[in-house]
Each structure stands twice: as structure tokens, then as C-alpha cells.
């Protein structure tokens, strides 16, 4: 991947690609922790997300949403708790802005499409840009169905990422791979998010090989990564490892999130 000068319209893309390049140069996959915005509450979110951000190559923050079809019970409960505590879409972006003032690590927002439309696509992109967001992960937006979102994101310097799954056809993988500007997100299993017992690579190597035929983009893997051993498995084939539910479970149990992040980050070494 050839580097290009950073401009207002490719800032997020360049920052994300630089993060992957640094991780690769150090012999590891990028470590990408996830936390639901405003969980367990707005004040604690800043502490927890700060601990994760300090150890991350890229941080993923989820917009809490009342109908998260792709999320398992752990992230659903986190969203419900955050929403009950008053964390709206706008408030999540304010929390990201506060994180950005303390740390320059790239941050991507995972959001379903409805919260974007509730705020207004142009306004959402403006707020995300002002908060220091580098990219968007859009799990329920087919890349060929709403080009306005991708165009607005690009205009505001935000990379866009779409998902592929083990059930994705080669034609679908090609479409998604070519539409992604930041990185490609491969779902390791069919179903919803969540740390799983016995999670294995399954169809992931095939998916990644196929995706890399169509686009020179980093490919990350998520859904089911729960510990250092699982992370190490994924790191052998992916450019980045996403861990979400394991951290939310740790917060709920009162465990040391920083220590868990250290373990999982170490697991990303090849």
C-alpha cells in the first residue's frame, strides 16, 4: 500500500493505515479493543476507554442503540445500560472528543444506520469529524445501497468499513472489499457478537484470502475473540484483532480492564 499525503478528505484513512503499518513492522496484528459509548456510565466510560486506548493500536467505540441486530446479549445489555444512563449518539461523540483530547490513537465508531439518520447524516459526520473520529464501521449498511453515507464520510475525512461473514459470496466479498476505505471487517462466525467458548478460525482464512484478491486494505477479524490464545490464533492470519464483549464482561465483573487488555495485546504478536 503506497502512502499518500494526508488531506482533509483522507485523514482518517491515512491514520488508520499508519496504525496497521506500525503494528506490522513490530511483528504483530493491530490490537483493536471495543467499548460501548457511555458504559457502564459516562464517567466510568472515560476511565475504562482511556485504559483501553492507552494499549490500543486503534480503538473502537460503539454508539448505544436500542435494536442492535448484530450484537449479542453482552453488548445489548451494555447499550441498554448506556441509553438508560442518558448516553445518546451526540453524547457518545462528546465522550470521544474528551478521549481524543488525552490520546491521539485512532478511534473508529461502530454504529447502526438509524442513529446516523436520527441525527442527520451531514450533521453526524460533522460532529464525528469535530470529535476526532477517524472512521466508521457500518454493520447494517450494504455498501451499494446508500452512497450518500460513504460520500459524506469521505468529505469529512472519515474512513468507512463494512463487514463480510462466512456466508458472504465471492461477489459480495468483492463488493465490500472495494467499498471499504479504512479496513475490511471479517466476522469470524455466523451470528452475533460475543466471546465464545471454543471460538476457532473456521472460514476466516478463506475469507481473508478472497478479500485480499480484491482490495489492498487491512483486514481485521472480530466476533468471538475472548482471550490471548484466541487473539493469537486470529493474529496469524489477520491484520487486526477486535475484542469487545470480553472487555464489557470484565467491566461488569469489576475486573482490571487494563490487565486484560495487556494480555490480549500480547496475544496479537505473531
From Swiss-Prot:
Keyword annotations: Amino-acid biosynthesis, Aromatic amino acid biosynthesis, Lyase, Tryptophan biosynthesis
Gene3D superfamilies: Aldolase class I
Protein's pathway: Amino-acid biosynthesis; L-tryptophan biosynthesis; L-tryptophan from chorismate: step 5/5
Stored InterPro entries: Aldolase_TIM, RibuloseP-bd_barrel, Trp_synthase_alpha_AS, Trp_synthase_suA
Active site: 60 (proton acceptor), 71 (proton acceptor)
GO cellular component: cytosol
Domain of life: Bacteria
Keyword Amino-acid biosynthesis found: yes
Protein EC: 4.2.1.20
Transmembrane segments annotated in the record for this chain: none
PROSITE patterns in the record: TRP_SYNTHASE_ALPHA
GO biological process entries: L-tryptophan biosynthetic process
Pfam families from the UniProt entry: Trp_syntA (PF00290)
Keyword Lyase annotated: yes
Catalytic activity: (1S,2R)-1-C-(indol-3-yl)glycerol 3-phosphate + L-serine = D-glyceraldehyde 3-phosphate + L-tryptophan + H2O
MF-aspect GO terms: tryptophan synthase activity
Record-stated family: Belongs to the TrpA family.
Function: The alpha subunit is responsible for the aldol cleavage of indoleglycerol phosphate to indole and glyceraldehyde 3-phosphate.
Subunit composition and interactions: Tetramer of two alpha and two beta chains.
Protein name: Tryptophan synthase alpha chain
Source organism: Deinococcus radiodurans (strain ATCC 13939 / DSM 20539 / JCM 16871 / CCUG 27074 / LMG 4051 / NBRC 15346 / NCIMB 9279 / VKM B-1422 / R1)
Organism classification: Bacteria, Thermotogati, Deinococcota, Deinococci, Deinococcales
Gene expressing this chain: trpA
Amino acid at each position: 500500500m503506497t502512502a499518500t499525503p494526508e488531506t482533509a478528505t483522507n485523514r482518517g484513512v491515512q491514520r488508520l493505515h499508519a496504525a496497521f503499518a506500525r503494528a506490522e513492522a513490530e511483528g504483530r496484528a493491530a490490537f483493536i479493543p471495543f467499548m460501548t459509548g457511555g458504559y457502564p456510565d459516562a464517567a466510568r466510560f472515560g476511565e475504562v476507554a482511556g485504559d483501553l486506548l492507552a494499549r490500543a493500536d486503534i480503538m473502537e467505540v460503539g454508539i448505544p442503540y436500542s435494536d442492535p441486530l448484530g450484537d449479542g446479549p453482552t453488548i445489548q445489555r451494555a447499550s441498554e445500560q448506556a441509553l438508560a444512563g442518558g448516553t445518546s449518539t451526540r453524547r457518545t461523540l462528546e465522550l470521544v472528543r474528551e478521549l481524543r483530547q488525552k490520546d491521539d490513537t485512532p478511534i473508529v465508531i461502530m454504529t447502526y444506520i438509524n442513529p446516523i439518520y436520527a441525527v442527520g447524516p451531514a450533521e453526524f459526520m460533522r460532529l464525528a469529524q469535530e470529535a476526532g473520529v477517524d472512521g466508521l464501521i457500518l454493520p447494517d449498511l450494504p455498501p451499494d445501497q446508500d452512497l450518500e453515507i460513504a460520500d459524506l464520510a469521505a468529505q469529512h475525512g472519515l474512513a468507512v468499513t463494512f463487514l463480510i461473514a462466512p456466508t458472504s459470496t465471492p461477489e459480495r466479498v468483492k463488493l465490500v472489499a472495494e467499498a471499504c476505505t479504512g479496513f475490511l471487517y471479517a466476522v469470524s462466525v455466523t451470528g452475533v457478537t460475543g466471546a465464545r467458548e471454543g471460538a476457532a478460525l473456521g472460514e476466516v482464512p478463506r475469507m481473508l484470502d478472497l478479500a485480499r484478491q480484491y482490495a489492498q486494505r487491512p483486514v481485521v477479524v472480530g466476533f468471538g475473540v475472548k482471550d490471548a490464545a484466541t487473539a493469537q490464533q486470529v493474529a496469524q492470519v489477520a491484520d487486526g484483532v477486535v475484542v469487545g464483549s470480553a472487555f464489557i464482561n470484565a467491566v461488569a465483573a469489576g475486573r482490571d480492564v487494563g490487565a486484560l487488555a495487556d494480555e490480549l495485546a500480547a496475544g496479537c504478536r505473531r
